[in-house]
Each structure stands twice: as structure tokens, then as C-alpha cells.
Amino acid sequence: MSGTQMSAFLRQYLADEDKKIRAQFKESDPNNKLILWMHEKTRITEEDLARPYTEDEVKELCLRTKVKVDMTAWNCLWEAKKRFEAKGRFVNKSERFINRMYVKAVRKKMVQPYPEEFVAQRREVVAAETKKHNISRLDRWQRKKTQNLSAQESSPARGAHLSFIDAMQTHEDQVNANLSSVSQINFQVEAIARPAVSSSDLSGIGDDEDEHQQSEFQDEHINCPETAINENSVRCDPINSGRMRTGCINSQGNNNTESDPDYYMFGTQLSSLLRPTSTQEPDDQVNCPETEMNESWVRCDQINSESMSIGPSIDSEGTITFQNSESEPIDVDSIA
């Protein structure tokens, strides 16, 4: 579609409009810069009117632009209608009555029809404005198409770049996994090749330290006669290899003396197993079968036989004896 040329009336009309706008919004005022910039962008020029439309542009405009018809522009009957409605003449009236009122308004020259020349000039102005709007629409749509095409062209390159990055990351992960497996294998090989440490190699470690601590302990307690322990009290006699009765052992603290606080002072209080205990009667110990224990339960290498009553034992001759030297043998026949 070929372009149109600007008529003299349209040129004069546009010049007058430009003067009005520039007179109202002066360039000296900095606040009017935006308004003047918008006016310069939307102003109709001869180049806009001379621009032809292509078939694709016409098709796109017809498909994407809504057609609007203003039936009230330069219509004297519309003006008469507004006057009658303002007076309330059309309230509850029929259509026939309304049409008769329009004819009457024109006949009596209440309203006059617009001249054809005036209507043609106004239509020319509207056509120029419409073409300016259409050119703006086409330019905007073309920019969007260009942006979409550039985005589509860049998307394959971006996808290839992302795939390359993923491949590199996968390769790095595989290399790291291989390195970790190799290091683990080397560690296992070193652990296997490392010579084992035997128990003989560890013998003697810490002996000097134990001897040094033992000598210091003896030096601390050498001058403490209150806490001195008789050699016979810590000597352990061999325990009977047979079954022994340990029940009902009296561990009363009847032998505590005034020297007990000395044990707490020097931190050398003996255990209850090493304290002298009173000797029980044979009858009290014989009547405790529930406390009978096997020698595997009580394995003691350092039990004081003189200060602790182990219990009676029967020899091959049928005589009940005690390990304590103070107890006398008991004849079984006399008891029966």
C-alpha cells in the first residue's frame, strides 16, 4: 500500500498544534523537558505519512488491531440528543417520538449539520493520527520479534555451554573418585606391608616408671609407724584347692582403734578385705550353704589367713580343721 502525501490543511493544522504545545510548555522550564520529548516522539511528520505498508504489515494490523467507529463525531443529531436528554424530553418516550424530535430540531435549526469540507478535513487529521499510531505499533512489534529471535539463537549456544560445563564437572568428579580409590588402595597396601608389633617388643616399657613410683611411695610411708603394716598381715597362705565356704564372714569393725583417723590423714586406709576380722564359730559358718562359692569365683592371691576366717575343712581322717592357727580341730565322731 502506497503512502499518502500531506495536504496544505494538514500541514497548517499540525504546525498550529505544535505552536500551541510549545507556547504552553516552554523549553526554558526544566520540568517540561519530558513533555516536549514525548511531543517530539508522537508528532506527525511527512515521512510518516509517506511510509508505505507492506502486505504482511497490513495483515498484521488487521489481525491485531480492533476497528472502532465513532458515530458521534461531527454528528448534529448526537448534539440534539444530548440537549433533549438534559431537559428530560426523552423520559418514557417511544422511539417514534424521539425521531420526530430530531427532525424538528434540524428543521427549526436548533442544530445544524456539519459541512462536508469540514468533515473531510477532520477525517484527514484522524487518518494521519491513525497512521502514526500504526507505525508505532509495527515498530514495537518488530522490536519484540527481534528480541525473541536473538533469544532463540542464543539459547542453543547457552545450552551447549551448559552441557559442556556439566561434562567437565562429571569428568572432574570421576577423576576425584579414581584418585580417592587409588589413595585408599595405597593405604591398605601400606597397612599390610607395615611390620606387626609383637608383645616381646613391648616388654619393659614403663618398668622404670613403675619402679620410680614404687620407690616414691615407700619413701613417703617409711616414717609413718602408725600406718606400718606387719609383714605377716599381708602374707597370703595358699588357698584350699577344694570347695571353700566363705559365707557368713563377719566383717564387723570391732577392732577399730584410735589410730583410724591416721589412715584417713595419710591416705593409707586398708581395704575391708585386709582388716583383721573376728573368728566365727564353726556352727555359724556351716549353716550357710547358699554362700558356697567355687574357687574360680574367688581367686585371691593375697588374702590374710591369720586375720580372716576362711571356714572349716574336712581332711581325709574326717577331722574338721580351720586355717586359722587359733582354732582347734573338731572331731566328727564326737559331734555325732
Curated annotation (Swiss-Prot):
Where on this chain is Su(var)205-binding Pro-containing repeat 2 (motif)?
289-295
Example GO molecular function: telomeric DNA binding
Gene name of this polypeptide: cav
Q: What is this protein identified as?
A: Telomere-binding protein cav
Q: Is the keyword Transferase assigned to this protein?
A: no
Could you tell me where the Polar residues compositional bias lies?
Answer: 308-327
GO CC annotation: chromosome, centromeric region; nucleus; telomere cap complex
> Which coarse location class describes where this protein primarily resides?
nucleus
GO BP term, example: telomere capping
Where found in the cell? Nucleus; Chromosome, Telomere
Domain of life of the source: Eukaryota
Known function? Binds to chromosome ends in a sequence-dependent manner and is required for telomere capping.
Q: Which UniProt keywords apply?
A: Chromosome, DNA-binding, Nucleus, Repeat, Telomere
Q: Subunit composition?
A: Interacts (via C-terminus) with Su(var)205 dimer (via hinge and chromoshadow domain) and with moi to form the terminin, telomere-capping, complex. Interacts with HP6, which is also part of the terminin complex.
The short motif Su(var)205-binding Pro-containing repeat 1 is annotated over 225-231
Q: Where is this region: Required for binding to Su(var)205?
A: 107-328
